[in-house]
Regions:
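Amphipathic alpha-helical interface elements
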Residues: 1-144
Length: 144
């Protein structure tokens, strides 16, 4: 089971990354943080290629940071969510470039990823979708 199960049917590629990310939060923090950023980028790029309100600002060469700053995205996402997405992107970049990481940062990232994926699923799912609350019990403890 996964906090991201709601993605499985329509966004299986993002689900697989998110599930793997979730499994690593307390075991391999750096990998979890980087994977959170990868899943965010896949989701953002999916939105830009599937939501006509975003088409004008999309260029596949743009970084996820540039896409997060685009005017069109600001019109369809709330400022608090965008702020969280920037934090996830920054923490992911820092982890990828060797900055110090820990399971607390990984926990922050997985929760932001959950917020983003929830927003994406509610906004774009072809069916009405129920998003359960984030369940900490589904995160591996690192003690096996």
């Amino acid at each position: 089971m996964s906090n991201f199960q709601f993605l499985h049917k329509e966004w299986s590629d993002i689900f697989e990354i998110a599930k793997e990310t979730e499994d690593m939060v307390n075991v391999r923090a750096r990998s979890s943080i980087v994977n959170s950023r990868v899943a965010l980028e896949k989701g953002i790029r999916w939105m830009y290629t599937n939501d006509e309100r975003l088409f004008e600002d999309y260029d596949e060469k743009k970084t996820v940071g540039n896409l997060l700053l685009a005017k069109s995205l600001k019109t369809i996402t709330e400022k608090p969510l965008r702020r969280e997405l920037h934090l996830l992107q920054r923490l992911g970049n820092e982890a990828a470039h060797g900055e110090q990481t820990d399971s607390k940062k990984a926990d922050i990232c997985i929760k932001i990823l959950f917020q983003f994926c929830s927003h994406m699923a509610v906004s774009y799912s072809s069916e009405e979708i129920q998003i359960p609350e984030f369940n900490e019990q589904l995160l591996k403890t690192g003690i096996e």
